[in-house]
């Protein structure tokens, strides 16, 4: 026998038993962003490598270690997108969507990072994100956070996630803080682990995000970013906090919160959970006012967030909120004998036409009554319809309840659609 080909490590299949939960999640996401007036944008999976080097930053872990980059037959360096924001900005610039305009956009699709696979972190993962362009004020920061809070409400996980907030200031404020932080770290270089020493000059704010206990202990005495902010930054952040309090969104200010991408400024945030162990961040984002100009467009204020769907699915499963997903099939239509098969197919088609949202499956492949009922039960259907010679002669259909302890019923064919509609 030929050797089986396996899926690539860290790139997983979503099987039929798993897809109903994914579909439910995707439906909630689409409906929620739609209710806020956001429009979908779809971008290619493959982009120029330079796009991510210029946006994410050449000295970030993503660009240095994690991107799937290759040279095509024309000699161009291409990369499987590791995140969605840069592609959205590139598309906005290219098609004139961002020039003197406000845009509220959302996207959903697969992303790729060559990380060490573990639960909740994969090499191909699905990301959902929202991006807003052209609005510089704190009210839009509040809106994207309200939108994310609405997602948790609709998914039933509000009590299991908490919001952490910080502000990184503007470019000048962050540059002054960067110099002060480097000077502090240089004085304590011997305490820094290898990663922190590597980041000390190239991206010192990422040292604040170190998971090393000794480094975190050292940082207790480090300069505080907020001490370097001017009135505009303080006012922006204060107004955001006031708006969140006004709509009842609770938050914690985390002065050590920085994002792993270079393009963020001012507001940054993460929604975190204690239910997933080390993979606690379920949504993250912030403001990135300089990125549009950095990628060749007119300087444009921007804010957004992204979430990995695999991690949300894992959270829903961990909290056992995946149990109320409806059946994949409502009605399973069987036929007892060749003479009844054509009518059974016609009945199934009539039900699909009368009940567009009903999930109707026709038995195919023959078999006796026992075999067909076994298939019906395995399908997860609520009821099986049995069409035999007697039913055919009397213009009736037998309805067998598969999930309830109820007697089989005979229903007139012309009343069947109404009966099924009430049942499901």
Curated annotation (Swiss-Prot):
InterPro entries associated with the record: aa-tRNA-synth_II, aa-tRNA-synth_II/BPL/LPL, Anticodon-bd, Anticodon-bd_dom_sf, His-tRNA-ligase, HisRS-like_core, HisRS/HisZ, HisRS_anticodon
Molecular functions per Gene Ontology: ATP binding; histidine-tRNA ligase activity
An example Gene Ontology CC term for this record: cytoplasm
Disulphide-bonded residues: none
Keyword annotations: Aminoacyl-tRNA synthetase, ATP-binding, Cytoplasm, Ligase, Nucleotide-binding, Protein biosynthesis
Main location: cytoplasm
Localization in the cell: Cytoplasm
Record flagged with keyword tRNA-binding: no
Reaction catalysis annotation: tRNA(His) + L-histidine + ATP = L-histidyl-tRNA(His) + AMP + diphosphate + H(+)
Pfam family, one: HGTP_anticodon
Domain of life of the organism encoding this protein: Bacteria
PROSITE patterns attached to this UniProt entry: AA_TRNA_LIGASE_II
Keyword Cytoplasm (UniProt): yes
Biological process annotations from GO: histidyl-tRNA aminoacylation
Enzyme category, top tier: ligase
Enzyme nomenclature, EC number: 6.1.1.21
Entry-linked PANTHER family: HISTIDINE--TRNA LIGASE, MITOCHONDRIAL-RELATED, HISTIDYL-TRNA SYNTHETASE
Subunit structure: Homodimer.
Record family assignment: Belongs to the class-II aminoacyl-tRNA synthetase family.
Name this protein carries in UniProt: Histidine--tRNA ligase
Natural source organism: Shewanella halifaxensis (strain HAW-EB4)
Gene for this chain: hisS
